[in-house]
């Protein structure tokens, strides 16, 4: 088809659908003996979009995975954290079952169950949320609680979270209302003391107050296509009661709050139960005993805790778990780098002692699984820089000495006459 204003005879052209002349429209597109204007094209697109929206819910109705299926999918990508995966699987299943069947069942109103994830850095909080969204094929966005402030102050407005979610689904409100929002670093917006402050705390308690309605469920007015708000503008109305909010944080020091509560009950003075150091619970064991009162002492306001009824705790990853993370998941780090090297026609081998060394380094840095990539990247940097310019390299071998920075990777060449480089 071509864009035409007049045919060869200079005759005035009209849209074959609405009858408007070429002077009344911006574009007139010509086909074999037929014309269509830009306005009719837009109308056709709107009709098709509406048809797709009507068909989509029927596909979704039969596609809700069971908690067992959700857990099995998480197992493919996330190592360990068995209890957290079970809690998440049930909470997510119940949330989308509620959406699918409406907010009421036999006259009983079904409440919304948002989720709070508590666990150290690099334990898999973000990965769990991302994997869930990918499995359910729903829009997903992340927000950093440390950048949020109350409306009217310098910083990011809490409603910007919904705007980001809309951007992920091309401003399709219906899709956005089925999405998942992950708010990271939620522990960083705790108030500075147990008692309500008489001064304004715009990035702590103030943000918690601002998030309350959004998380519980409200109709948020969001400017279309990310424009700034002004009075004459039409807003997109997004019902957040259908959006699943997952909040996560490391909550450093929460274990001490729990420990104090637990040990206070063991008595004082001559009647106290004396515990040896070896009898004391680990950080993970203490976090598993978290109660709302502990979170209040930490600095979250009671109303905010009430909006996050499902709590899942994640343990710090052990050295063995980090080694598993390096090689077992479907998108394991070693598999990713092997795929990159395969694109150059080269095999990449990680020896077992190299994986041990990577895990030890990550443990020493206290960065959890998040620190694994930077360690591997540093070890392979020079090789990835030189490899595209080299010929006849068949294989690259990484051992413990490479990870420790004592030698370069071993390069194995395909031709016998080629010189081998051991990096010694």
UniProtKB/Swiss-Prot annotation:
Binding-site list for Zn(2+): 15, 18, 37, 40
Result after altering residue 185 to Q: No ATP hydrolysis
Required co-factors: Zn(2+)
SMART domains in UniProt: AAA, ClpB_D2-small, zf-C4_ClpX
GO molecular function: ATP binding; ATP hydrolysis activity; ATP-dependent peptidase activity; ATP-dependent protein folding chaperone; disordered domain specific binding; identical protein binding; protease binding; protein dimerization activity
InterPro entries cross-referenced by the UniProt entry: AAA+_ATPase (IPR003593), ATP-dep_Clp_protease_ClpX (IPR050052), ATPase_AAA_core (IPR003959), Clp_ATPase_C (IPR019489), Clp_protease_ATP-bd_su_ClpX (IPR004487), ClpX_bact (IPR046425), P-loop_NTPase (IPR027417), Znf_CppX_C4 (IPR010603)
Record's note on what induces expression: By heat shock. Part of the clpP-clpX operon, clpX can be expressed individually from its own promoter.
Positions annotated to bind ATP: 120-127
Null mutant phenotype: Delayed and decreased induction of the extracytoplasmic-stress response.
GO CC annotations on file: cytosol; endopeptidase Clp complex; HslUV protease complex
CDD domains in the cross-refs: RecA-like_ClpX
Gene Ontology biological process: cell division; protein denaturation; protein unfolding; proteolysis involved in protein catabolic process
Top-rank taxon: Bacteria
UniProt entry tagged with the keyword tRNA-binding: no
Domain ClpX-type ZB: 2-56
Effect listed in the UniProt record for changing residue 370 to K: No ATP hydrolysis
Record family assignment: Belongs to the ClpX chaperone family.
Function, as annotated: ATP-dependent specificity component of the Clp protease. Uses cycles of ATP binding and hydrolysis to unfold proteins and translocate them to the ClpP protease. It directs the protease to specific substrates both with and without the help of adapter proteins such as SspB. Participates in the final steps of RseA-sigma-E degradation, liberating sigma-E to induce the extracytoplasmic-stress response. It may bind to the lambda O substrate protein and present it to the ClpP protease in a form that can be recognized and readily hydrolyzed by ClpP.
Complexes and interactors: Component of the ClpX-ClpP complex. Forms a hexameric ring that, in the presence of ATP, binds to fourteen ClpP subunits assembled into a disk-like structure with a central cavity, resembling the structure of eukaryotic proteasomes. Interacts with Mu phage DDE-recombinase A; this interaction remodels the viral transpososome for replication.
Name of the protein in its database record: ATP-dependent Clp protease ATP-binding subunit ClpX
């Amino acid at each position: 088809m071509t864009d035409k204003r007049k045919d060869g005879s200079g005759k005035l052209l009209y849209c074959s659908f609405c009858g408007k002349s070429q002077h009344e429209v911006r574009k007139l597109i010509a086909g074999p003996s037929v014309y269509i204007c830009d306005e009719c094209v837009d109308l056709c697109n709107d009709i098709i979009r509406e048809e797709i929206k009507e068909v989509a819910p029927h596909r979704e109705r039969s596609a809700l995975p069971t908690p067992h299926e959700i857990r099995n999918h998480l197992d493919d990508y996330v190592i360990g954290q068995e209890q957290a995966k079970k809690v998440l699987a049930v909470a997510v299943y119940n949330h989308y079952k509620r959406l699918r069947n409406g907010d009421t069942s036999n006259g009983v109103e079904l409440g919304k169950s948002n989720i709070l994830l508590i666990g150290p850095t690099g334990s898999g909080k973000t990965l769990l949320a991302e994997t869930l969204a990918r499995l359910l094929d729903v829009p997903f966005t992340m927000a950093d609680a440390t950048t949020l402030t109350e409306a009217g102050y310098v910083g990011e407005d809490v409603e910007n979270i919904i705007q980001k979610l809309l951007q992920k689904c091309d401003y399709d409100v219906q899709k956005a209302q089925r999405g998942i929002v992950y708010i990271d670093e939620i522990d960083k917006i705790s108030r500075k003391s147990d008692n309500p402050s008489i001064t304004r705390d715009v990035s702590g308690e103030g943000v918690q107050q601002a998030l309350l309605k959004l998380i519980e469920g409200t109709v948020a007015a969001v400017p279309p296509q990310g424009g700034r708000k002004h009075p004459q503008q039409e807003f997109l109305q997004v019902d957040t009661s259908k959006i699943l909010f997952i909040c996560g944080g490391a909550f450093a020091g929460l274990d001490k709050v729990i420990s104090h509560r637990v040990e206070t009950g063991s008595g004082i003075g001559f009647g106290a139960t004396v515990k040896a150091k070896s009898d004391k619970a680990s950080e993970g064991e203490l976090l598993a005993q978290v109660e709302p009162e502990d979170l209040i002492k930490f600095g979250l306001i009671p109303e905010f805790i009430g909006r996050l009824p499902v709590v899942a705790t994640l343990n710090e990853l052990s050295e063995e778990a980090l080694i598993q993370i390096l090689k077992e998941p479907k998108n394991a780090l070693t598999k990713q780098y092997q795929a990159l090297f395969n694109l150059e026609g080269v095999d990449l081998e990680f020896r077992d002692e190299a994986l041990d060394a990577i895990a030890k380094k990550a443990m020493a840095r206290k960065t959890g699984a998040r620190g694994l990539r930077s360690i591997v990247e540093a070890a392979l940097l020079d090789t990835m820089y030189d490899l595209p310019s080299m010929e006849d390299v068949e294989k690259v071998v990484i051992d413990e000495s490479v990870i420790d920075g004592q030698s370069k990777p071993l390069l194995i060449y395909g031709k016998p006459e080629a010189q081998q480089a051991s990096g010694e």
